[in-house]
Amino acid sequence: MFLILFTLQIAFLVSATDENHSDSEKKLVPNLTFKDFNNKKVKLDQFYENGPILVNFWTLSCEPCKKEMKHLSKLNTKYSEYGFKVLSINMDSPRTLKKVKQFTKSQKYTFQILSDPRMELFRKLGGSVMPLVVFINNDGTIESRHIGYNPGDESLLEKEIIDIISSNSSDSQIQNLKPLSNEIIVE
């Protein structure tokens, strides 16, 4: 039974890894309110109003999520000077929040982490499998989604980051941005 479920999940991940939207069908992301780890309320548009963002959804029990987040932290540092940000949304229940805070503090992530225990945004964006990454333009439209994580996916995400930075800027230097390396880190 486990093998059947695992096979079905892999088949779903392979078929749904990259979903790009044409301009005519781009959807606006709902502007929901979340709490950060200091219990401060923040709205989603505060993050994308100054540049494009990558939103990743995760839980503490999702090992692929945690592997992906290491790479997202590096990409956030690398591309933040271009107005790009990574925003992480944890969907664990409030009773595990202390463990989530301890984990994120130990990892020293370079991006903001918000809490959405009801998985409201995840569901509104059609999420069903984690990790889920959603690229959002600075006008609030959803550029693309990536479902699941396999070693090497960080290179695909980096290319998408460069594309979204370039398409959201008129600066010719930014439009010619290239990955600094094609290095793939296998863990």
Question: What residues fall within each predicted segment?
Answer:
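Bacterial N-terminal signal peptides
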Residues: F2-A11
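N-terminal "domain-start" segment that seeds a small globular fold
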Residues: S15-D45
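Short active-site neighborhood of thiol/selenol oxidoreductases, capturing the structured segment around
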Residues: L44-E63
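Hydrophobic beta-strand anchors of alpha/beta hydrolase catalytic cores
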Residues: L54-V55, V86, V133
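Structural microenvironment flanking redox-active thiols in thiol-disulfide oxidoreductases
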Residues: K66-Q107, P117-R123
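Thiol/disulfide oxidoreductase modules built on the thioredoxin-like
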Residues: Q102-Y109, P117-I162
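Non-globular targeting/processing and membrane-anchoring segments
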Residues: S166-E187
